[in-house]
């Protein structure tokens, strides 16, 4: 499954980047990527990746069977992080969850679409049947990326997530893709 990496991704306007799995040596680059994100992007992430200890833990405890992180690099820097989260046993072992974070300066070039497409392909190869993604309901560009990748909006949970900086609640959109229908 990972033998095809690294691979080049050609995006809109000829922009090119390299996709590959994260390795433990990515600590510095991954941390730089996360701290470069604007505060408005960071406030709705599930974890606080500006906490260096957290990123150190991610890089130290890599287990591709549970969390498969795919990075996009351009000119030596990380410009996107996408992760496929899986349960290895129990009632949810056929379902994966994906999370995608894209650097502001490379948005609107198709990188988000490409990262979602890449994780969907990896999930299918791993034998998963369904994928789930969550996005703040007001993040319409992100929701559109998922929908263009075959995800359906199945629910919107009202006032479900809280912006930890401004103490405001937001709605969250739940999107699902059925991999058995492709």
Q: Over which residues does each language-model region extend?
A:
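Conserved GNAT acetyl-CoA-binding A-motif
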Residues: 116, 123-135
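Short acidic N-proximal helix/loop "leader" segments that mark the beginning
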Residues: 1-13
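Glycine-rich phosphate/pyrophosphate-binding loop shared by adenosine-nucleotide-utilizing enzymes
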Residues: 15-17, 75-81, 170
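Acetyl-CoA-dependent GNAT
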Residues: 47-105, 116, 178-180
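Conserved catalytic-core motifs of GNAT/GCN5-like acyltransferases
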Residues: 132-135, 143, 147-168
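A short beta-loop-alpha structural element at the N-terminal edge
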Residues: 16-29
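Glycine-rich phosphate-binding loop
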Residues: 106, 110
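A short gly/proline-enriched turn/hairpin at secondary-structure junctions
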Residues: 40-47
């Amino acid at each position: 499954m990972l033998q095809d990496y690294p691979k080049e991704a050609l995006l809109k306007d000829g922009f090119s980047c390299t996709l590959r799995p994260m390795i433990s040596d990515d600590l510095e680059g991954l941390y730089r990527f996360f701290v470069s994100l604007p505060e408005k992007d960071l406030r709705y992430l599930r974890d606080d990746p500006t906490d260096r200890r957290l990123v150190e833990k991610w890089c130290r405890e890599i287990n591709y069977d549970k969390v498969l992180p795919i990075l996009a690099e351009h000119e030596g820097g990380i410009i996107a992080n996408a992760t496929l989260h899986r349960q290895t046993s129990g009632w949810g072992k056929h379902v994966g969850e994906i999370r995608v974070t894209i650097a502001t300066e490379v948005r609107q070039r198709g990188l988000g679409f490409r990262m979602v497409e890449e994780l969907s392909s990896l999930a299918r190869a791993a034998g998963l049947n369904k994928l789930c993604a969550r996005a703040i309901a007001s993040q319409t560009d992100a929701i559109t990326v998922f929908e263009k990748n075959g995800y359906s909006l199945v629910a919107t949970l009202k006032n479900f997530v809280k912006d930890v900086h401004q103490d405001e609640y937001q709605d969250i959109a739940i999107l699902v893709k059925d991999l058995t229908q492709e």
